[in-house]
Amino acid sequence: MLWLPLLRRDVVRNSPATATNSRNGGAGVARKIFHPHHQLNPYHNHHQQQQQHHQQQQSYRTFYTHLPQMPQYAYVPPTPIYQPLSWRNPTCTSTSRPLPSAPPSLITVNPPPQRPWLPLAKPNKTRPACIFTVMCYNVLCDKYATRQMYGYCPSWALCWEYRKKSIIDEIRHYAADIISLQEIETEQFYHFFLPELKNDGYEGIFSPKSRAKTMSEVERKYVDGCAIFFRASKFTLIKESLIEFNQLAMANAEGSDNMLNRVMPKDNIGLAALLKVKENAWEPMSEVTQISQPLLVCTAHIHWDPEFCDVKLIQTMMLSNELKTIIDEASHSFRPGHKNDSNAVQLLLCGDFNSLPDSGVVEFLGKGRVSMDHLDFKDMGYKSCLQRLLSNDTNEFTHSFKLASAYNEDIMPHTNYTFDFKGIIDYIFYTKTGMVPLGLLGPVSNDWLRENKVVGCPHPHIPSDHFPLLVELELMHTASQQAPPNGLINRR
């Protein structure tokens, strides 16, 4: 029998932010009714645990070491109906030995059916293009995965030693060329994810959240952060950049106490990797493909608290401003003596933005602008410091990236699935002037979730409270869209 905290169930039922769904024999699956300001449910258990983690970092210990031998479970990841084009490349096949597993002993629910592969477009074979897949996945780090927060999941299925096998199997199964991960603990990156994925032909970069700088070496091991992995046969790392929002807030706080008191204390980060596409990744190859083509990949984990929607939006604006600086510098290095051309560097932005599709964060990223009077700013008096930060004196804040979201609500109704919150907070954005989505991974079967009364994740078959996103993109060579510029450096 699974233990469900009655107090939490009552809180969810009585919360104006939720309503229960009593279908399927009164399973009581919480269904989100959004507030006018479209913020996340304040009872989102994962976010409550993050807050406790900030307050109780000192008390970390490895969980479940005292338990008897856990049941081994051979994770069976779903196989897409249609495979992405890039999967037909043998370099995408994992060469690493799978982690050992045994038949399940306590699993009473069949695994979910395959997540469908949804074709969107055919590649344009008349121009050089690099076809690649990208995954975005919040893996739910060990520190946050407690019985107090996820009482509907068996203890053994919450244990990291069990979940990490399913997570790495899922990552390997989809074999994305670029992998964007959030909530990766420092020790787990260096001692698990990096060595495992290096065996599969990946290189990776990582940074923990900013608080790690103030901690001892022992405590630092358990701070989570963001990671980017890329297939070494397709990409080369040119430069990596860490974006620390608390440092940016402190440097731009003049004239706004709220920038110091609300934004600066939050230690979320963004991590960017400037990659060069290798020549053999282009099809068809031509003289144009001998010209170096940079791609900027960024992963971010934005602040969680729904009461701080202003912080979420400001962190996202800071992120876009820093990415613009990186792109401008990269464009200048590839085109010396010429005016910066941001189109020379394509942008891929992935992450857990903890923001719903109709939030200020997603409006800013997707539309390229947001009003200074947007409700998410909460009239906190950020106008002057944001104008100074973004060099903007108009009535709206803008960016010039021309981004599009790979997923929408019709395709993926939820990327985060817990007992008291189900919604979209994870995104993959791409430069729509330089990339075309060819296909994407569809959602987990809603029928399977309903018929098996899966009220939330993690679950013995689903290792995180987030579902991974996977998109196949066709990257067009910028030199094929226009005459090659004079002076473009060939950095082969």
Task: State the predicted function of each range.
Residues 2-46, 55-121, 265, 277-285, ...:
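Metal-dependent phosphoester-hydrolase catalytic domains
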Residues 105-131, 172, 178-304, 308, ...:
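Structured beta-strand-rich core segments of catalytic domains in phosphoester-bond hydrolases
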Residues 109, 154-177, 188-194, 199-200, ...:
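Divalent metal-dependent phosphoesterase catalytic cores across multiple superfamilies
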Residues 134-135, 349:
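Residue-level marker for buried hydrophobic side chains located in beta-strands
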Residues 139, 184, 302, 352-353, ...:
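Active-site metal-binding loops of divalent metal-dependent hydrolases
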Residues 140-161, 246, 250-258, 262-263:
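Acidic/histidine-rich helix-loop elements
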Residues 162, 166-167, 183, 188, ...:
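Acidic, Ser/Thr-rich intrinsically disordered and amphipathic helical segments
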